[in-house]
């Protein structure tokens, strides 16, 4: 898998933005990706050094439209800790 297939989008929330100040970034990633693949993809895409990764599988929410019930897709979130003094400039402007 290439890093374009692994990294899907940054997580956009107040909690994620406050963590960016401490060098911790959150991304939605491919559910099939492993921690080592995620680490390599982030280091290759952004040119930073990753020192820790936590991952979690987030189940899709049930949604209802009228009398029909559906479910959103399950997703995987990766919380990435960067080396001291490093940041991802592409996401720094959003915080």
From Swiss-Prot:
The keyword ATP-binding does not apply. SUPFAM superfamilies: Ribosomal proteins S24e, L23 and L15e. Pfam families: Ribosomal_L23. GO terms for cellular component: cytosolic large ribosomal subunit. GO terms for molecular function: rRNA binding; structural constituent of ribosome. Belongs to the universal ribosomal protein uL23 family. This is Large ribosomal subunit protein uL23. It comes from Deinococcus radiodurans (strain ATCC 13939 / DSM 20539 / JCM 16871 / CCUG 27074 / LMG 4051 / NBRC 15346 / NCIMB 9279 / VKM B-1422 / R1).
């Amino acid at each position: 898998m290439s890093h374009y297939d692994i990294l899907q989008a940054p997580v956009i929330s107040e909690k994620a933005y406050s963590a960016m100040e401490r060098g911790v970034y959150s991304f939605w990633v491919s559910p099939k990706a492993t921690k080592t693949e995620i680490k390599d993809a982030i280091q290759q895409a952004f040119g930073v050094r990753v020192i820790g990764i936590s991952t979690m599988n987030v189940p899709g929410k049930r949604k209802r439209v009228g009398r029909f019930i559906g479910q959103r897709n399950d997703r995987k979130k990766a919380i990435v800790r960067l080396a001291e003094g490093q940041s991802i400039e592409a996401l720094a402007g959003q915080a």
